[in-house]
Regions:
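Helix-loop junctions and terminal segments of transmembrane helices
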Residues: 53-69, 142-143, 201-202, 254, ...
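Membrane-proximal transmembrane or re-entrant/amphipathic helices at the cytosolic face
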Residues: 413-417, 438-493
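Membrane-interface helix-loop junctions in multi-pass transport and translocation proteins
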Residues: 27-34, 145-148, 159-190, 360, ...
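Alpha-helical transmembrane segments of multi-pass membrane transport and lipid-handling proteins
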Residues: 81-110, 163-170, 191, 289-343, ...
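Interhelical loop/hinge segments that connect adjacent transmembrane helices in multipass membrane
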Residues: 1, 116, 176-178, 191-233, ...
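Signature of the first transmembrane helix
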Residues: 1-64, 94-98, 102, 127, ...
């Protein structure tokens, strides 16, 4: 597993590194406005893609057991059902995308609307639909513990085509060709996935029989997917509507950095997730809860580390990377840091929940979506971008840090609300002590004179190392953290 994590980490860093250059040249040669439009398209398509309804997660979960038991008949039935689902979804997505085309000007605060935007939109739509060519293979290989193969194919294809896109941006300055490269990338991935499938999965056969178990989980996961869309894919649309498309482009540059951090987190999660499903199916609640606490305390550590370093370093990074005129104010960055923290610490709870097959808590995503949308719109009208981000924070605290953990503790671990208060109360104390100590210790090292990459690298290394060491010392107050150190560090010595 360590090898898989390291390989995944290297690929993630490489993709992100190329992505930073890609974003910089995009702004320089094509413009911040087109970048904003592109990011807006991505969020629109996420909403239209709601018709996917969480089939991917439900299908992966459904395949774990038959693959482990070598029940190839059941695997064939489930895969046939997946293919049927996604063929229908592709057609529905195309029709919805065409119907949504006339509404594009309503969401874009532009001085003039260029008709080429409609063409860009249709191509972006086709790009999303083309991913359904190979989605069943991704689901199958992931459930069969072949995630690293999926990662290889997707990563190397993306890296090659990212480089092509940068060349096109600089030499031709064409957004149209930029999108066509995305389509070609998906086609190449499909070919490689298809080859691997034909060589290694000859035991899977075509069948008209359908797996009915997916319907229940899909209905429940639909609400989780809808809530995720509203929480994670509303900000840019609201910023475009209430602020400007240029601010969308600027905020998207910050999001690119946050996405890199999220990808680093997902590197670990993507390797753990399939193994977690098997562990839960073979162990009792107490063992599962013990594992949850061990992993969760590590992600609390990472959440504070990432969010504090991001708050301290991101504006200087943006200034050196694309220019000081694209920097957001410090309070906005503070709010971004809070969201990053919650986004990091939530992933373990969500993964234990999904691996346990706990999908029927539809009240959680509905509540989260309503709170997020209402507060984001209300505060967005009053406070602009800061209000929109605050709306997301309010829903995250209410549902993700309070309501949902209580449900998971009860359903997945057989623990009551007192145990939740005890554990999360301890986390809150650790957070408060950590921030207090970090504010004191890092204060003498804060700089305002970052003018080059060398300056930033030295500054970032200093802040990151100090933050990591301070957090390590503070987290020794936690029993679960101490046990991890004893078992995985001291025993090896």
């Amino acid at each position: 597993m360590k090898k898989e994590i390291i390989i995944n980490l290297i690929l993630t860093i490489l993709i992100s590194f190329i992505g930073f250059f890609q974003n910089k040249y995009f702004i320089q040669y094509i413009g911040i406005e087109i970048l904003g439009i592109m990011k807006l398209f991505s969020q629109f398509l996420q909403y239209l893609n709601i018709i996917e309804m969480g089939i991917g997660n439900a299908s992966t979960f459904a395949l774990y057991k038959p693959l482990a038991e070598k029940n190839y008949k059941q695997v064939s039935i489930i895969l046939s059902t997946i293919k049927s689902f996604y063929n229908k979804i592709a057609l529905m997505l195309f029709l919805l995308g065409i119907l949504a085309t006339p509404t594009l000007p309503f969401f874009m605060k532009l001085e003039s609307f260029n008709n080429m935007i409609y063409i860009y939109w249709i191509l972006y739509l086709l790009n999303t639909i083309s991913t359904y060519l190979y989605i069943k293979y991704v689901i199958l290989f992931t459930a069969n513990q072949e995630f690293i193969l999926v990662r290889y194919i997707q990563s190397f294809s993306k890296i090659i085509f990212q480089i092509f896109q940068i060349i096109l941006i600089v030499k031709i300055k064409s957004f149209l060709l930029y999108i066509l490269i995305l389509l070609l990338d998906n086609l190449i991935q499909y070919i490689f996935f298809k080859i691997h499938y034909n060589r290694n999965y000859s035991y899977i056969y075509k069948t008209k029989e359908k797996y009915q178990g997916l319907n229940r989980d899909v209905k429940n996961l639909f609400w989780h997917k809808l809530a995720g869309l509203i929480v994670f894919n509303t900000d840019l649309i609201l910023i475009s509507k209430f602020v400007s498309i240029e601010i969308v482009g600027i905020y998207a540059s910050y999001q690119l950095i946050l996405q890199m951090i999220s990808m680093l987190v997902n590197v670990i999660i993507s390797v753990i997730r399939p193994k977690l499903g098997r562990f839960i199916s073979l162990n009792l609640n107490e063992k599962i809860y013990e594992l949850f606490r061990k992993i969760n305390i590590l992600f609390l550590y990472l959440g504070i580390l990432f969010s504090y370093c991001t708050y301290t370093l991101i504006n200087d990074f943006i200034g050196v990377w694309i220019g000081s005129k694209y920097i957001l104010d410090k309070f906005t960055v503070f709010l971004i840091g809070i969201n990053l923290f919650i986004g990091t610490v939530r992933v373990i709870l969500e993964n234990f929940k999904e691996a346990s097959g706990f999908f029927d808590d539809i009240q959680s995503p509905i509540l989260e979506a309503i709170i997020n949308f209402v507060f984001s719109v209300f505060l967005g009208v009053k406070f602009g971008i800061n209000g929109i981000i605050m709306g997301t924070i309010i829903s995250n605290i209410t549902v993700i840090l309070i309501y949902k953990p209580i449900l998971v503790f009860k359903r997945c671990f057989d623990k009551d609300i007192k145990e939740y208060i005890k554990v999360y109360g301890n986390y809150l104390i650790l957070l408060a002590i950590s921030l207090f100590c970090l504010n004191i210790v890092t204060k003498p090292f804060i700089r305002e004179d970052i003018n080059s990459w060398l300056d930033w690298i030295i500054y970032a290394t200093t802040i990151s190392v100090i933050t990591g060491v301070v957090l390590f010392i503070v987290f020794l107050l936690n029993k679960d953290f101490r046990n991890i150190i004893k078992v995985h560090v001291l025993k090896k010595k």
